[in-house]
């Protein structure tokens, strides 16, 4: 609701919540539907008012906030890698100057998926000691020693400072869940449009990507459906005006439909087509981004 919007007033917005402990009492939920400036001290506001039971998330209707995690969805979703040092990120040209067999992977963050990929790579020395890195990959060792260690030397966390050649978080759960998969599903944690896509298993995901250890296009189709998107908007959170995909409340609580084999096959086929079509169009038109694609789609709808 707008604060006083005059010359001597504060140009801010506030949210006020007043309640009392009574599980059976009817609450009132008023939502701003329109604002108009008629030259007075503030804005004239139109409200849409509903009366009913208010849940913990200050919403009425289905109590989405009370949904619990489903056992079937456990151990599947994880955040991407938290590297803790820009020195691990290198260009293809820089990678070419290091050992050909060094553990270097293609790297994608949220902007790479929604915008145009930077084409960068990531040094990932997980599972190796510093001595093993120095003996097997001396050039890579020197690169990380010069570009990561100086910053890590000032880190207050002993484990991060002492294991300077490794990423800040090892993400062992993520690595174990993706092991053996040819591809996995990823979505950007905070994004204007909720888009799910397949990433090749060779691609290292950034911490701002939510990764699902599933390679079945039937799952991709369900997650891309309007039903799941509606669930995400109700169960997730927001950052400014952008929805945030919280894996614990958006994925782990989501009840997948009990589809028949024929329905699964149809959804699987459509999802493969969708994923391939988007990637094909972006390959044919390098300036085309997923955000731009879905902005146009939103206008058409």
Show the residue positions of the predicted features.
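Conserved beta strand-loop-helix elements of the APE1-like EEP
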Residues: 11-26
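Short, charged, solvent-exposed linker or helix-capping segments at domain edges/interfaces
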Residues: 27-32, 265-266
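S-adenosyl-L-methionine
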Residues: 1-14, 38, 42, 48-301
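Sec-type signal peptide cleavage vicinity
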Residues: 23, 34-36
